[in-house]
């Protein structure tokens, strides 16, 4: 019985760290975030962190970061006239080409077409 309680507490503890990292990503998506930094924040080893994150949130830290960045990009595409390279930089991509390919991989459409479509809806 005590063993079960300890396992439960351990699970709660690591999940708390994972949610802390998810929140950290939500606030720091616009800069480079290294896996070591995330693991340290979660209080887990670098090797264990990725699988613990995926177990808790259903996706890898990298795919979570990309999802957040693409979500922020959509807002900027819909509400501003920033250039694609400005948007790429604002959401943490070093190159506009990387942003464009990630955006297309995530949404099925390139950013400029997404912007066009969103402008037509208003």
Q: What are these model-derived regions, one by one?
A:
Residues 20, 24-26, 32-68, 82, ...:
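Basic/polar phosphate-binding segments, predominantly the helix-turn-helix DNA-binding elements
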Residues 1-9, 13, 17-20, 48:
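An amphipathic alpha-helical interaction segment
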Residues 1-4, 28-29, 80, 118:
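A general structural signal marking secondary-structure boundaries and capping sites
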């Amino acid at each position: 019985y005590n063993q079960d309680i300890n396992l439960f507490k351990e699970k709660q503890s690591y999940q708390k760290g994972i949610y802390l990292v998810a929140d950290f990503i939500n606030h720091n998506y616009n800069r480079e975030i290294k896996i070591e930094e995330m693991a340290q924040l979660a209080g887990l080893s670098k090797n264990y962190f990725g699988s613990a994150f995926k177990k808790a949130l259903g996706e890898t830290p990298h795919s979570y970061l990309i999802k957040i960045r693409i979500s922020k990009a959509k807002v900027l595409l819909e509400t501003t006239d920033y250039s694609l390279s400005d948007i790429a930089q604002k959401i943490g991509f070093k190159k506009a080409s990387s942003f464009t390919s990630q955006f297309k991989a995530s949404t099925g459409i390139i950013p400029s077409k997404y912007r066009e479509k969103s402008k037509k809806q208003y």
